[in-house]
């Protein structure tokens, strides 16, 4: 199983959409607090529809608590400052894919602690600053899931 990590998410509908995505793919979701909204925010519930009960969500008090609880063996950070494209990574079961807050991305303290090959990016045309968080998560999730052969999915010939 793969893991999505949202570092201090700010916009409830994005997190709700990602909850729904995790329910549909079997990925686990980790949220590193503080969040920019309350967990019972109606916009979060609306975007996630009734998928909350089908998603494994773990909330962590802060980044240190996340590291202590999960001890990720392979942690990839999505950043516009990354070099390898998300599709150049050979994903493995158990990987963690971390995304920063919508308005500022991941802090330098986290990025600087990772090797260059674990700071990955989604290719974009020149002069594009960033993608919407839930869209970016979807792009990476489906590439990783595809590489692993869509475990748990119902595939039709």
From Swiss-Prot:
Its EC number is 2.1.1.207. GO terms for biological process: wobble position cytosine ribose methylation; wobble position uridine ribose methylation. Signal peptide: none annotated. Keywords: Cytoplasm, Methyltransferase, S-adenosyl-L-methionine, Transferase, tRNA processing. The keyword tRNA processing applies. S-adenosyl-L-methionine binds at residues 78, 100, 122, 130. Coiled coil: none annotated. It holds the Pfam family SpoU_methylase. It catalyses: cytidine(34) in tRNA + S-adenosyl-L-methionine = 2'-O-methylcytidine(34) in tRNA + S-adenosyl-L-homocysteine + H(+); 5-carboxymethylaminomethyluridine(34) in tRNA(Leu) + S-adenosyl-L-methionine = 5-carboxymethylaminomethyl-2'-O-methyluridine(34) in tRNA(Leu) + S-adenosyl-L-homocysteine + H(+). One of its GO terms (molecular function) is RNA binding. This is tRNA (cytidine(34)-2'-O)-methyltransferase. The gene is trmL.
């Amino acid at each position: 199983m793969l893991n999505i990590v949202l570092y201090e998410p700010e916009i409830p509908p994005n997190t709700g959409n990602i909850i729904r995505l995790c329910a549909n793919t079997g990925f686990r979701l980790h949220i590193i607090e503080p969040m920019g909204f309350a967990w019972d925010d109606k916009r979060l519930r609306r975007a996630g529809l009734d998928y909350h009960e089908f998603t494994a969500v773990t909330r962590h008090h802060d980044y240190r608590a996340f590291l202590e609880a999960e001890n990720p063996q392979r942690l990839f950070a999505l950043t516009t400052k990354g070099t390898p494209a998300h599709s150049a990574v050979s994903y493995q079961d158990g990987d963690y894919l971390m995304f920063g807050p919508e308005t500022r991305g991941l802090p330098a303290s986290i990025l600087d602690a990772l090797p260059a090959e674990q700071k990955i990016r989604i290719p974009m045309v020149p002069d594009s600053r960033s993608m919407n968080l839930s869209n970016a998560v979807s792009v990476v999730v489906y590439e990783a899931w595809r590489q692993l052969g869509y475990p748990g999915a119902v595939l039709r010939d």
